């Protein structure tokens, strides 16, 4: 595996292998006072973010540093991108400096694929990891979500996973649908008609407008943020009406199965798609998702950058 651009790049066995590797990293680091491994010593990793990020960027940086890599962060707002430099020239510059991997977030769908073609023609050059490209894909988020589900429930196959919210603009939902359906989960999308993607009837999912009907027997309920920064025009009448119909209230949380878990890829809008108290409830796995993000991204960097003879 040279790059990680989309969940569709991975076979079922490769997905399971990455989940297992992430669990191994967690086990190795657990209880260590100094969380440091020599696995990527001498490797150089660039994070190149054209959009804001807290969880993804900081967890990739932490993952790289815990593996002893040199991690260099570049923000588009403070680089030559601000002067008009193209994605191609930015990528080639980082490659010439000596990048072993470039982790990129970009507002344009397909940008990660383009970068990989620019910097690694014929497979020679740095690995590219897609940290989110427009509304297209966010493969590392889907992998850490699957890791969290597996840790909480013991399996993924046969589970009913209900994803609620802005499915239209979400790259997370696209990656999760691909991954969870590959691993044998039943995936249901719940949203108002205006926030479901065109062609969703051709996806390997069911879709519904009725949150209460679908979450009653759900094993996992994943809430999504309304991405107002990607919206032009009105997609729902008001925030209050949206929260009433599609928010995870205390009443809805109380009606879930005892074993059901609640997830959210973040950032959360407390009081809109999730109640303030529910966000901190024991069944809510948000902070476990964040913690797993580091171990999952360590596994990804290990697979792409460490080399075939490397050991943890």
Curated annotation (Swiss-Prot):
Catalyzes the condensation of carbamoyl phosphate and aspartate to form carbamoyl aspartate and inorganic phosphate, the committed step in the de novo pyrimidine nucleotide biosynthesis pathway. Transmembrane segments: none annotated. Belongs to the aspartate/ornithine carbamoyltransferase superfamily. ATCase family. Pfam families: OTCace, OTCace_N. L-aspartate binds at residues 83, 171, 225. This is Aspartate carbamoyltransferase catalytic subunit. The keyword Transport does not apply. Its EC number is 2.1.3.2. Keywords: Pyrimidine biosynthesis, Transferase. It catalyses: carbamoyl phosphate + L-aspartate = N-carbamoyl-L-aspartate + phosphate + H(+). Pathway: Pyrimidine metabolism; UMP biosynthesis via de novo pathway; (S)-dihydroorotate from bicarbonate: step 2/3. It comes from Corynebacterium glutamicum (strain R). Carbamoyl phosphate binds at residues 55-56, 105, 138, 141, 266-267. GO terms for cellular component: cytosol. One of its GO terms (molecular function) is aspartate carbamoyltransferase activity. GO terms for biological process: 'de novo' pyrimidine nucleobase biosynthetic process; 'de novo' UMP biosynthetic process; amino acid metabolic process. The keyword Transferase applies. It comes from the Bacteria. Heterododecamer (2C3:3R2) of six catalytic PyrB chains organized as two trimers (C3), and six regulatory PyrI chains organized as three dimers (R2). InterPro entries: Asp/Orn_carbamoyltranf_P-bd, Asp/Orn_carbamoylTrfase, Asp/Orn_carbamoylTrfase_sf, Asp_carbamoyltransf, Asp_carbamoyltransf_Asp/Orn-bd. SUPFAM superfamilies: Aspartate/ornithine carbamoyltransferase.
């Amino acid at each position: 595996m040279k790059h990680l651009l989309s969940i569709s790049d991975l076979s079922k066995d490769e997905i399971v292998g990455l989940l297992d590797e992430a669990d191994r990293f967690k086990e190795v680091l657990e209880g260590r006072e100094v969380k440091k491994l020599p696995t990527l010593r001498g490797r150089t990793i660039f994070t190149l973010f054209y959009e804001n990020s807290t969880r993804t960027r900081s967890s990739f940086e932490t993952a790289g540093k815990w593996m002893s890599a040199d991690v260099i962060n570049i923000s588009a707002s403070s680089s030559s991108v601000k002067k008009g430099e193209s994605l191609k020239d930015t990528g080639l510059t980082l490659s010439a400096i000596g990048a072993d991997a470039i982790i990129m977030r970009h507002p344009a769908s397909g940008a990660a694929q383009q970068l990989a073609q620019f910097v690694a023609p014929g497979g020679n050059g740095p690995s590219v990891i897609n940290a989110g490209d427009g509304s297209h894909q966010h493969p590392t988020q889907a992998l850490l979500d699957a890791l969290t589900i597996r840790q909480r429930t013991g399996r993924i196959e046969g589970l009913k996973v209900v994803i609620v919210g802005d499915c239209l603009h979400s790259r997370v939902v696209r990656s999760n649908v691909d991954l969870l359906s590959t691993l044998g989960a039943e995936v249901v999308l719940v949203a108002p008609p205006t926030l479901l993607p065109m062609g969703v009837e051709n996806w390997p999912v069911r879709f519904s407008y009725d949150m209460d009907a679908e979450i009653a027997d759900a094993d996992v309920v994943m809430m999504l943020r309304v991405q107002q920064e990607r919206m032009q025009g009105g997609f729902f009448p008001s925030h209050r009406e949206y929260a009433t119909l599609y928010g995870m209230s205390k009443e809805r949380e109380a009606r879930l199965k005892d074993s059901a878990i609640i997830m959210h890829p973040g950032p959360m809008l407390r009081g809109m798609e999730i109640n303030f108290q529910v966000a901190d409830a024991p069944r809510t796995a948000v902070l476990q998702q964040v913690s797993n993000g580091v171990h999952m991204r360590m596994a990804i960097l290990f697979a792409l950058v460490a080399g075939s003879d490397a050991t943890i």
